[in-house]
Amino acid sequence: ELVEHAAAVEGIERIRLGSLDPDMLSESDIRRLAAVKKLCPQFHLSLQSGCSKTLRAMRRPYTAEQYAAIAARLREAFGDENLSLTTDVIVGFPGETEEDFEQSLRFVSAQRFLKVHVFPYSRRKGTAAYDFPDQIPEHEKEARSRRMGEAVEAVRADVAAGMRGMHAEVLLETPLSSTLFTGYTRQYLPVVVQAPGHQSGDIVPVCIGEWDGQRAKAALLAASL
């Protein structure tokens, strides 16, 4: 309801939701959100692990299968080619076996996230997990973090490559020079574009180009989309 009210405000061109737990989105919610044209088709859907056993240990209120079902509903509602998902993943949670990690790695790769924040589990006093048995050695947590990071970056590059040649609208954010800007598409793809005559805050039409490992190089289009 708040999103719908915000979309009705004149001058607001883009609405982007922050981090969401998958159990927060009902089918009705997804249908209503998909009808809001100003809502960016990008969702940061918190995952934490792609292994249901690990999710139970984390006391998350969903399984990997339930997460995948919500992601599929979002893709169906917004269009698979139009929607992008981002998430957070923890590796090395107490009790996570190599098999559990591999399962999480496969799940995360299959979801084709545009961006994944990967964190090694950090043991903190006062939390339930602090006293859990089978704590993972630091060197193993670091190794799993590297492996997960390499996998998600490969997927990120592949997803970005799939957007090459597409026309999109970019919100210009940080100026790198008087004419060169970084910015984001509605799908939260980071881009860099030469946009003489424009300034931060402008929304400009571009053609998505090559991915450089951090951003997509984009070319400014003369006409509005």
Language-model region placement:
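Conserved SAM/AdoMet-binding glycine-rich loop
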Residues: E1-E98
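A glycine- and small/hydrophobic-rich beta-loop-beta segment
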Residues: T87-V89, F101-Q111, V118
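Terminal RNA-binding accessory module
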Residues: D131-L225
